[in-house]
Structure formats: structure tokens, C-alpha cells
Amino acid sequence: MAMEVTQLLINAQSIDGTVRKHAEESLKQFQEQNLAGFLLSLAGELANDEKPVDSRKLAGLVLKNALDAKEQHRKYELVQRWLALDMSTKSQIRAFLLKTLSAPVPDVRSTASQVIAKVAGIELPQKQWPELIVSLLSNIHQLPAHVKQATLETLGYLCEEVSPDVVEQEHVNKILTAVVQGMNAAEGNTDVRLAATRALYMALGFAQANFNNDMERDYIMRVVCEATLSPEVKIRQAAFECLVSIASTYYEKLAHYMQDIFNITAKAVREDDESVALQAIEFWSSICDEEIDILEEYGGEFAGDSDVPCFYFTKQALPGLVPLLLETLLKQEEDQDLDEGAWNIAMAGGTCLGLVARAVGDDIVPHVMPFIEEKISKPDWREREAATYAFGSILEGPSADKLMAIVNAALTFMLNALTNDPSNHVKDTTAWTLGRIFEFLHGSTIETPIINQANCQQIITVLIQSMNDAPNVAEKACGALYFLAQGYEDIGPSSPLTPFFQEIIKSLLAVAHREDATESRLRTAAYEALNEVVRCSTDETSTMVLQLVPVIMMELHNTLEGEKLSLDEREKQNELQGLLCGCLQVIIQKLGSEPTKSKFMEYADQMMGLFLRVFGCRSATAHEEAMLAIGALAYAAGPNFAKYMPEFYKYLEMGLQNFEEYQVCAVTVGVVGDVCRALEDKILPYCDGIMTQLLKDLSSNQLHRSVKPPIFSCFGDIALAIGEDFDKYWRYSMPMLQSAAELSAHSAGADDEMTEYTNSLRNGILEAYSGIFQGFKNSAKTQLLIPFAPHILQFLDSIYMEKDMDEVVMKTAIGVLGDLADTLGSHVGGLIQQSVSSKEFLNECLSSEDHTIKEAAEWAKHAITRAISV
């Protein structure tokens, strides 16, 4: 088979489609019929220096893909399949992989490094292949340079794949020693130094104990800083990447090194290759991110007794750092204004300047204003654009008091520049800066309004005029209008935008119809601005919003009439459908209540027909937006929505079955909740189908985990809608809730993402319990719930004891305690009295500063008192 595998791998890369397809099918068949033989053949191919490079590289890639996948359920299957292989096969594959590290071909060695790391990622947590790290490190000093390079690369990938708690500290120390020695200037081979520097980047997460040791930390930092001065660009870049990672991982250990780091970052930004300079700027962005997080967590003024101290590195560096960043703003590229994906030193510098402003607040203003004042009127467009970019970058962070006078003085100048500056670059940045002014310094919370009767008309006229400019400028003008409208969100019965409403709407629709509207996200920006203008409008303009309904409906209708379209045209059309459905959703929410409801509902049948047709277009984005619009329509229509259910139900079911496009599934679950609230017990005929599908979704390991919390919430919505009729589902739903509750109560998040997910899961479970209790209240069937009370109280106690719940969970949890007492009364009085929740947790909520938590707790306290006193 060996010869045949070589040929199949070569054929699988053939330009002849028939040959390629046949080879791919044969490889797939081999894999399905004899997995062990298949993997062994691939590893043998990869390790054989006599085989063609192309077949070896593909063998490694196929082998890697047989061990890992992006989708969690698929990854789990592949891991189980590997673990099920007999030990002899696995040992032979491992031996082949380790042998390949000494192959003369760099690409082949690199592929083997990645595959070894994938195997380690599966086996080390299972306490298998314990000798791997020792065998990689055993004679690293005696190895030829190319093998040393491959070994270091393998160690780097291994650290990326494996969790730090899986590797013993003794092995971690040895890995770091080998890596740091490989980085040392004494190492003569450039490839080895580069591999070592990249490996350190991946191994930093393992170095906690080493960074706690002063001598070891000093040594690592010295070697990294020396590597930033290497003659090789790639090594310098990789060394700065290490510093960026150290800034976020070991911020609190950096004080001793900051002066040296400032000097080397400044030198790199001013003199080095752009790829290196970008990383040097990124170091300061990371420092700012850390300090912003610390200061936000401790409410602005940092308290000295906190876990992570704030060292104010950014504030101390201001006199040197700000001039350095301002210099970068002058290094624009000629066409960056036309390239949406552009990223260069000027953009990185501006982004970092914005983070500095957020980290230090008012202190940045005197450091930046002289630069702005000097350059804002210069003949060279670069200087004008840099000054404008600097101004826009510091608008978030400093207080309104500090900025107000400056912004008031600059506003007229900015409006003139947007109209008259000859440079597209300058106009682009000016429109963006105006958007930032309206985002951060305009709104009901600002004492002295920037926009007043005197300048409102000029601002709107200039923005509307700029919507006819080049697509990139027009897109930013739409963005500025978006924030202008948003600032009037809580304006009351009368809005300063009312006199201009019709003109604004007309102009935005005209922009959306421009022939070049698909450039620079222009069409999307126009509809986003239109939505915000509608959302923040007042009753004064409701007639005009109503007139918009048939216009948008006709646009949506036209997208559904298209004849045969090319792939590109179809994609643009689907995007437009999504935007139009999103626009209709905002209009429904605006007009779907009195006094406009009755007039608006005349369009409901036509609108529903259009949304159902959108489902036929098979575009996930449009599908999501149409589904959300239907949710809004259900809320507006209330019980009358029942007439749409016979036709809509099949699409609802399709959405719940859509595991692939899980966002569609998540949105559909939310819409089930909307429909339940609208129809109440009229949803009953559809509940068997909906509950069956929701239970299937929960049992599936193919569905993205983020959809599962809203499914639990949806149980609550259904129970609340159908009341005691939910009894036919509780025997299936309650055990599922119980097992999910046990899992979430004790899965304290290993990281922020896990904590967030755990809280989301707990909230979903609690919302389900809340809906079920409220749905069964005053029913003869409440006794069905009594056996679950001990478990629910235990769940509440355990999540309280974990001390990691967020405020949303806190409010829902105390609400469930009240619902349980309210619905089950004296049946559970004794149990409640024994729980931690009814004492410590309740008292904590009663003294909460969040009035919604406090109100929920007061209600729960009354319900508990009633349950105990009966």
C-alpha cells in the first residue's frame, strides 16, 4: 500500500479535477476501512526521506486533520478515535514523527512538529506518552542545527496545544531553559534563535513560577530584550511579540524593566522595519489595555489593597510616549483611506494613542494639543490628517469638562474641513473624528451641549453633503449621523432632528442606492444610520416613519424578484435583504405600539409574507434578520400573531434544526420566546414539536454551546405561556435542567470566557425554573414541582458559595428563590429556612446598590415570610 499512498497523495494535488477527486475518494475510503493502517501509512510517508516532498507535506497535513478539528463535536470524535487505537500503532506513529524532526526538508520538519503537538494535546492530559518531553530535550545541545530548530518549534507548538497544568514544573523548567538558551546571542544559527524566540512566545503561559522568581525572570527578560536588537528582522519581531505577551500576562512583574523597554520600543518605532515597529507599538497598547482593565475594575481611582496593582506605567511614560506616537501618525500610506483592511504604523500609533487617552484621561490633553494646533492648517495633507487623527483619538478617556472648550472651538473648523479640504484622507479622518465627538461628547448626560440651535442645521447640512462624497468619506459621514441621532435617544417628546427628519431619511436612502454603495461598507453604514435615526425619533415624526414602511417593503420585494444572479450578485443581494429586514425590525419596534399600532398593523400581512419568502433564499444573515423582525412583529401583534403560525411554524422548526449556522438557531430560540409571550396559551398546539426539537438541541454535541443557555430560558417562556399544561414536558425538561445545574454550579470558570459562559448557562437554567414556577402557580399540579425544591435550593446555595456570579445571575437567582416560595408556599417553608440562600444571599441582595436586585430581593423576602408563616 505504501507506493499506492504516495501516488494517491500526489494525485490528490493534481490540477486534473477527475484525478484529484478519485484520489481524495480513495484516501477517504482507506481511512474509513482501516484507520490504524491509514494513519501509520501517512506517518511512514512523512518520515521517509526518499519520498517526494509534496506527498510528505500532504501526508502530514492529512494526519494533523485526522487529530483535530475546529468544531468541538468533531474534535471530540477524532480524539476518541485516536485514543482507541492499539498501543503498538500509536508507538510506531510517534516514532515516525520524532524521526521526521531530523529530515533535511524544512517544510516536512515543520509539519511533523505540528503533528507531534496535536498528538501531545490528546495524550499528555491522559497521562500517555510521558517520555515525550524528556526525549525532545535529552540531547538538544548536541543536535545538528536543523534538528535543534525543529525540536524547539515542536516545544513551542506543544505549549500552544497543552494546558500548563498538564506539564510538571520540572519539565516546564527544562523547556524554558532549552528555549531561552536557544535564543541566546551565543547561539550561532539564526533559524535556531528564531525557532526558540517563537517557542518562548507560546511557552510564556507556562512560566508563572519562573516569573515569580527574581533571578529567572531577570534572565528571561534580559534574553528577550537582547533578542529585540538581533540583526535579523524576524527575530526582532518575534522578540517584541514576546514582550507584548509578557505585558498582558505578567504586567505586575514589569516595573523593574520599564525604562529599558521604553528605550528599545522607542528605537524600534523610530528606526526599525515596519513589522518590528508595529509590535513595539503593540507593547504599549497591551500595557494600556491592562491598566484600563485594572482601573475600570476598581472604579477609576485605584485602591492599593487590590489583587493586581496599577503601576501607572502609561502615565509615567507620557512625556516620551506621546511624542513617539504622534510621530507615527505622519507615516500614513498614500492609499490607506481606500483600503478597508489597511494596517500600518500610522494606524497602529493612532489606535495606541486612543488607548493611552483611555488609560490616563485628562493628563493626555496638554501633551497632544500643541501637535494638533501646529499641524491642523499646514499645506501638507499628511500633517493635517495626522493632527485630525490625533484629535479624534483622544476623545474617549478625558472628561467632558476637559474637552468641551477645545471641541467647541474645533467644531466649525472640522465642518469646514469636511466640506472643503482637497484631500480625501483628511476628509475621511475628519468625518470619523466628528463621529467620535458625537459618540462621546453629545447626549443627555452632557451638561453643556455641543450641538445647539445655532449649529445643528450646519452639522446636518455638512453630513448630508458629505454623503455624496467618495464612498469612504460618505461611510464615515453616515457613522457620524448615527451617533448624532443616538445622542437624542432620551430627548423627550420633541427632538432637534425633527425639522430635518425627512431630508435625513431621503438622503440616507439615496446613499443606499448609490452605484458604489457596496464599497467601503457604505450601504451597511447608511442603513445602520437610518435605523438609528428611526429608533431615536419621537412621536412628532411617526407619520414619516409610517410612510417609510411601504418604501422599505418594496425594496425587500425587489430583492426577492431577481432572476438568475452570479454568486457575487447573490451575495450582495442577501446582504441587502438582511439590511432591509433589520430596518423593518426597527420600524416594527417603533410603530408597533399605540398610537401608531393600528395604522402600522395594516402592513403586517404583507410584511410577514416577505419575511417568509426571505427564508427561501438560504442566506444565514438574511435568515437571522428576518427571524428577528418576525419576533418584533409577534410582540407587536400579540394574540393576533396566531394567524401566521400555520405557515411560519415550519420555518421556526427549520431554524431550531440549523446546527450548522448556530447563530440562526440561537435567534430562532429567542423568537420562540417572543411568540410565546405574544400568543400565551395559543402556542399550545405547536409545543410538542417545539419542545421535542429543543430537547434534541440540548442533547446534541454538534450544536454550539452558546445556544444552550437560551434554550433553557425558552423552557421558562413556554411554561409561562401554557401554565399547567407544561406538565407533559416537565419529566423530560426537569432532569435536563437538574444535570445542567449540577454541571454549572461547580464549573467555576478557568478563564474569563468560561466564567462568562457559566454565568450565561446558570442564568438560562434559572430563567427556566422561574418560568416553570410562575406558570404552575395556583394550579392543582404544583405538587409535581415539590420533589425538585431541595435540588433547586442546593443549586442556589452552591452558586452563591462559588462567589463568581455576575449581577444578571444574582437578580435571576434571587427571583427564583422568591418564585419557589411564592408557588410552593408552606410545602417548602422549612427547606427554605435551612438554605444559605434565604439568609446570607438574600441579605446581600437586599443591600445591593443595583435597585433591580434590591427590588427582586424585597419581593423574595415577602414571599419567604409568607411561606414560613403559613
Curated annotation (Swiss-Prot):
The UniProt disruption phenotype note reads:
Delayed development and flowering, reduced length of leaves, stems and siliques, increased sensitivity to abscisic acid (ABA) and increased drought tolerance.
Tell me which UniProt keywords the record has, alphabetically: Acetylation, Cytoplasm, Nucleus, Protein transport, Repeat, Stress response, Transport
Localisation: Cytoplasm; Nucleus
Cellular component terms per the entry's GO annotation = cytoplasm; nucleus
Q: Give GO terms: molecular function aspect only.
A: small GTPase binding
* Record-annotated Importin N-terminal domain positions: 23-103
Regarding tissue, the record states: Expressed in roots, cotyledons, leaves, stems, petals, stamen, stigma, siliques, embryos and guard cells.
Start and end residues of the HEAT repeats are 4-33, 35-67, 87-126, 132-161, 172-204, 214-249, 255-304, 313-361, 365-395, 403-440, 456-492, 498-535, 542-588, 596-637, 642-679, 684-722, 730-776, 826-868
> Which Gene Ontology terms describe the biological processes this protein takes part in?
protein import into nucleus
Residue numbers bearing the N-acetylalanine modification: A2
Establish whether keyword Acetylation is in the entry. Answer: yes
The UniProt similarity line reads: Belongs to the importin beta family. Importin beta-1 subfamily.
The subunit field of the Swiss-Prot or TrEMBL record says: Forms a complex with the importin subunits alpha IMPA1 or IMPA2, the nucleoporin NUP62 and the Ran-GTP-binding proteins RAN1, RAN2 or RAN3.
Annotated function: Acts as a negative effector of drought tolerance. Involved in the regulation of stomatal closure and in the abscisic acid (ABA)-mediated pathway that lead to drought tolerance. Does not directly mediate nuclear import of ABI1 and ABI2 which are key regulators of the ABA signaling pathway. May be involved in nuclear translocation of other type 2C protein phosphatases that mediate ABA signaling.
Name the UniProt record assigns to this protein: Importin subunit beta-1
Q: Which organism is it from?
A: Arabidopsis thaliana
Q: What is the lineage of its organism?
A: Eukaryota, Viridiplantae, Streptophyta, Embryophyta, Tracheophyta
